[in-house]
Amino acid sequence: MLPWLPAHRVAFPAVEHALREPDGLLAAGGDLTPAWLRCAYRHGIFPWFAPGEPILWWSPDPRLVLFPEEIHVRRSLAKRLRNAGFTVTFDHAFEAVITACATTRAAAEGTWITPAMHAAYYRLHIEGDAHSVEVWRDGELVGGLYGIALGGVFFGESMFSRVADASKVALVHLARHLAAHGGRLIDCQVHTPHLASLGARCIARTTFIDYLDQYVSAPVSSSLWPAAPSADGCTGASRHGPGADMRRGDMSREST
């Protein structure tokens, strides 16, 4: 039986209890407050649910990750980075990026970025833990991505493109920025050829949790993000003891 999480206590089951089918489904219930979200990501868990469903929490195995220094830029993409007239910014238009991710997906296949999810991640952005990368051309927002940053880990949430390769440009700039300022890992969630072509690879969930234990508390440059992650005091179970998705439509897939 799937565990139901009461909203008044921020705590998760150990990720080892996640279902194999559907892969990674761990629990239902809880809340989308900043404390819940910080606790979830810290333990390798993320929310994904369709409109009308309860909050569902996931921790798939294996996990797709990208080490920033391993970003792979093909010759054609390198040419677009140089010559396509893109300007890239960080945290200049977070709400516009998350709105674009939601509306672009909704037009194509439906979206998991409900108004409640939108509001939850915007609150995290205001508190300094959610960030966006924007890609502009001729003053218009043509691509981008957003996610959660805890210490040296960036947990990618969603990306979009309105012109060819704009989300790839955002990811390349994110990886280079993280590599230059102490970032250690980008969580891309589940395997796709699109992200694998950029250097992402699958690792076991146990290895992913080990990396979180190391990198979430790793020191990073103060110039990495404008605000440091807030403390949360959550409790969570992991294979190291207390405290120690398959998402359809996330960093693993590009909206166009």
Curated annotation (Swiss-Prot):
Any GO molecular function: leucyl-tRNA--protein transferase activity
Record keywords: Acyltransferase, Cytoplasm, Transferase
Bias type Basic and acidic residues, positions: 245-256
Catalyses which reaction(s): N-terminal L-lysyl-[protein] + L-leucyl-tRNA(Leu) = N-terminal L-leucyl-L-lysyl-[protein] + tRNA(Leu) + H(+); N-terminal L-arginyl-[protein] + L-leucyl-tRNA(Leu) = N-terminal L-leucyl-L-arginyl-[protein] + tRNA(Leu) + H(+); L-phenylalanyl-tRNA(Phe) + an N-terminal L-alpha-aminoacyl-[protein] = an N-terminal L-phenylalanyl-L-alpha-aminoacyl-[protein] + tRNA(Phe)
Span list, region Disordered: 232-256
Entry's localization field: Cytoplasm
Entry GO CC: cytoplasm
SUPFAM superfamilies to which the protein is assigned, alphabetical: Acyl-CoA N-acyltransferases (Nat)
E.C. numbers: 2.3.2.6
EC class name: transferase
Any one Gene Ontology BP term: protein catabolic process
InterPro entries per record: Acyl_CoA_acyltransferase (IPR016181), Leu/Phe-tRNA_Trfase (IPR004616), Leu/Phe-tRNA_Trfase_C (IPR042203), Leu/Phe-tRNA_Trfase_N (IPR042221)
Annotated HAMAP family: Leu_Phe_trans
Recorded family membership: Belongs to the L/F-transferase family.
Function, as annotated: Functions in the N-end rule pathway of protein degradation where it conjugates Leu, Phe and, less efficiently, Met from aminoacyl-tRNAs to the N-termini of proteins containing an N-terminal arginine or lysine.
Name recorded for this polypeptide: Leucyl/phenylalanyl-tRNA--protein transferase
Origin species: Chromohalobacter salexigens (strain ATCC BAA-138 / DSM 3043 / CIP 106854 / NCIMB 13768 / 1H11)
Organism ancestry: Bacteria, Pseudomonadati, Pseudomonadota, Gammaproteobacteria, Oceanospirillales
Originating gene: aat
